[in-house]
Amino acid sequence: MNILFKTTVLAASLLLAACNNNDDQEAQTAPSTNPSKYYQTKTPYQPQQDLKSYEQAPTGFQPVFTELVARHGSRGLSSLKYDLALYNLWKQAKAENALTPLGEQLGADLEAMMKANILLGYGVEGIRQYGYGNETMTGILEHRGIADRLLQRLPTLLNAQAPILVQSSGVDRAVDSAKFFTAELIKQQPQLKDKIVPLSYTNLSSGSVPSVEDGGVDRFKLYFHSLNADEDLAQPLSVSQQKIYDASQAYQDFEENNKDLAQKLDELSKNTQAEKTAQMVLSPIFKADFIKKLGTTGYSFSNTGSFTVTPPKGEQITEKGKGKNTIASAVDAAAYIYELYSISGGMKDELKGINFDKYMPLEAAKFYAEFNDANDFYEKGPSFTESNQVTSEIAQGLK
């Protein structure tokens, strides 16, 4: 049995692309019938069908192998950017008395969002370093749920003597996801601990770190989109690894410098619906005169400055923005609100009842999800004919 944890791809054999959020091995979770909220890639995992409805092995046959390729679980924001930039914008609107009653609520909600992300994983066993980019409790339960469903789906395979091979990209949240998955296997069936390889995936302790050396990390297989000389050329490469490395460099150059790609993304950004959608999002929050000022002199807002929180132990923790993310128009401001809306779907526990749905009309969410999907199609997906399969050649290690 092979278990691979990526940071970019979600797929699984035997329809194991979803999970329940219940630690009880006997629990059965019905598929979700909730309408889409257009969280796009931030959509929390849900079972796609009732476990009992999966096709059974034909009479006289039994499962002998399964492979799961999974993305990390639901996470928080990757860094202090959209939230801080919006907070700086909000403070200016507050100073000018340019907030609606709904807009008045946004400040406290942004503060709660920043605090939740700064403390994400704080005191949680299995999270190596708390803070931005970590899995949320929803994300942790997703991978525990996948393990539970696997045990129910293939009990005879997991009871066999075959090893359970686990690898990840080495990125913190991917490693942690793999560990929560294996921890649930061990919790439900302790004898499986001796079958999990390498040993570093059998312990939630932050001191147990999978590596290239123990076989628990393979960036050429699971982080191929971002290989670099410092991390990936320390040892001589095999012929196949060299091909993947070269393909990775070609992809990164394509993403940064390809003129056809830049032109296509520019065309997408000039969608005439963008301004109308931005007004739909911003008008209930900010007064019209303030919205008109966005992008004019003095009315661009970046993620500059810092935000300080106090965790349960009483010490102060300060996170600083890098100033690289800027709101230079109403369109930018609305798109940033969508980013917080979409991430909030997987942060229910951490946000403690704060709901960003009130800031994002469903029609607007649909627009931003479709816009992001279109960008991803050209940057990461099939792209266009002239890209010469540069977006797929990097994945040759998965063949």
Residue ranges of predicted features:
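Residues in flexible loops and secondary-structure boundaries
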Residues: 9-13, 143
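C-terminal motif of bacterial Sec signal peptides marking the signal peptidase cleavage site
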Residues: 15-18
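Bacterial signal peptide processing site
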Residues: 20-22
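Sec-dependent signal peptide recognition
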Residues: 2-10
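Signature for phosphate-centric chemistry
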Residues: 27-163, 169-399
